């Protein structure tokens, strides 16, 4: 499982990288992202999400707002769908991996 958050609002990503216990997730100061539906400086179910990511052997990664906007545009052009930025976050991450490969 891969958890994706906006890079400038990523408390789960930070907790994952710091190897914090799920009940020790820290608030993300000055959190801001264009992906408003996932813009939460302390996700209410963050402890469960972090546990699920770890138990699956997964990752928690952040994507920049610009990457989400590019993915949003790509989805609109290829699929004729206009999605909110949060919905394009996973596609943005996939695009990052695709570019690195």
PLM region spans:
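Active-site/ligand-binding loops adjacent to catalytic centers
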Residues: 2-83
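Conserved phosphate/anionic-ligand binding catalytic regions in large, soluble enzymes, centered on
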Residues: 83-93
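Catalytic phosphate/nucleotide-handling subdomain of diverse soluble enzymes
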Residues: 91-101
């Amino acid at each position: 499982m891969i958890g994706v958050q906006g890079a400038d609002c990523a408390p789960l990503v930070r907790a994952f990288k710091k190897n914090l216990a799920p009940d020790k997730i820290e608030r993300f100061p000055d959190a801001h992202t264009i992906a408003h539906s996932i813009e939460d400086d302390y996700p209410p179910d963050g402890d469960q999400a972090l546990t699920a990511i770890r138990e699956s052997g997964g990752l928690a990664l952040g994507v920049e707002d610009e990457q989400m906007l590019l993915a949003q545009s790509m989805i609109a052009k290829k699929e004729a769908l206009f999605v909110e930025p949060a919905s394009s976050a996973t596609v943005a991450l996939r695009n990052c991996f695709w570019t690195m490969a």
